[in-house]
UniProtKB/Swiss-Prot annotation:
SUPFAM superfamilies: Metallo-dependent phosphatases. This is Uncharacterized protein C630.12. GO terms for cellular component: endoplasmic reticulum; endoplasmic reticulum membrane; membrane. Keywords: Endoplasmic reticulum, Membrane, Signal, Transmembrane, Transmembrane helix. The keyword Transmembrane helix applies. The keyword Membrane applies. PANTHER family: METALLO PHOSPHOESTERASE RELATED (PTHR13315), METALLOPHOSPHOESTERASE, ISOFORM E (PTHR13315:SF4).
Amino acid sequence: MKVGRFLVIIAFCFYVLYLEKIIHTRPHKKCDWRSWEQWESTGNPVRIALVADPQLVDDLTYDYPRPLIGIVKWISDQFLRRHWRYLHKSLKPDITFIMGDLMDTGREFATEEFKKDYFRMMNVLDPKFTNKLEIYPGNHDIGFGNHAIVKDIQRFESLFGPTSRSIDVGNHTLVIVDGIRLSNNVNPQVYQPARDFLKSFETNKDNSRPRILLSHVPLFRPAINSCGELREKDDVIKYGLGYQYQNLLLPELSESILKAVEPIAAFAGDDHDYCEVVHNYQVDTREAATTEYNVKAFSMTSGILYPGYQLLSLNYPYDNPKADQKSSYQTKLCILPNQIQIYVWYGASISIFFALILLRTAIFFFGTDRYSLPLYKTHARRFSLSTTIHLFKKIVRITLSTFISYTWIPFLLFIFLNIFII
């Protein structure tokens, strides 16, 4: 093997390694807890990863031919699987929350279809990589409001526990409030458990523990409230609704949740993009304020360029309710790479390299005496159509052979890195 060819192959291997490994592990390393936590030496922080809207692509997601939907499922699953593993291997959070919308059309599935995609999800988002995993539903899992599906709620709770619940950890109470079921007002079987749960916080307030509100659908805010500079799409979230969908809880419900829980911070999913707003409200005669963070979608098929997740660090080493609870949490947005852009880089690189080999091969053939252009008209040769076609086929055949000889090793490396995600 010539030295030049060897160096080109090595360069391609490093290129593949960068696009398949380094570019994917780097965001998680940049989010290392020690790089952004600013706690004093007191206490031992509890570290939490918030993962929103994985929305596994399924057979009903896109109106594509079956082979194409299979490719899209494989690519999107690989992205989720890769970053799920890298997140937990790099950051090792104490608890991981999946904040709803596990599958794209899970609420439409019959039992057998659901089982099939449930096991697929457990393979992609493998719980064995987590220290502790908590999952609650989104509208893609159980429907929304008056159209929430009872059998889907029962199925979800049988697998993952109550859709509204609280978890005490690190001297904090994490309060999962099911705004989807609270938005129902026609079926007591749907709304009553969620209302009872919320009422229990309203009547039995223990202010010694700071509370963090977790939900799927964000709380209501005026359409003029800016989401901040970290958002990709429009600067605001405007109220909207559709089939089994509502992008903000209603104002009255939002206020009742805030008053009942009185959280020091709130986190929601559903919107797919980042948003940070402050909710001001009154509890009795007191003025209160809560910052709500919308967590980016974890999926590459969620309509944003850069998926992500949120880290939450809790540190409240006090039993004194008068201690400063607002400063007991810190949070960090972690942004994942643009997978579509990576495939564009692959496509551009392959196209340019193939074109260069084709050009070099063509120059070689047309530069030889046999195929060179005549210097004088008297030396003109007549090229038949069959000769031209034969020459073209020969150039393409040699170009392909040369291209494969340079790229088969990098291609095997690509396959290896996708089969064995390390």
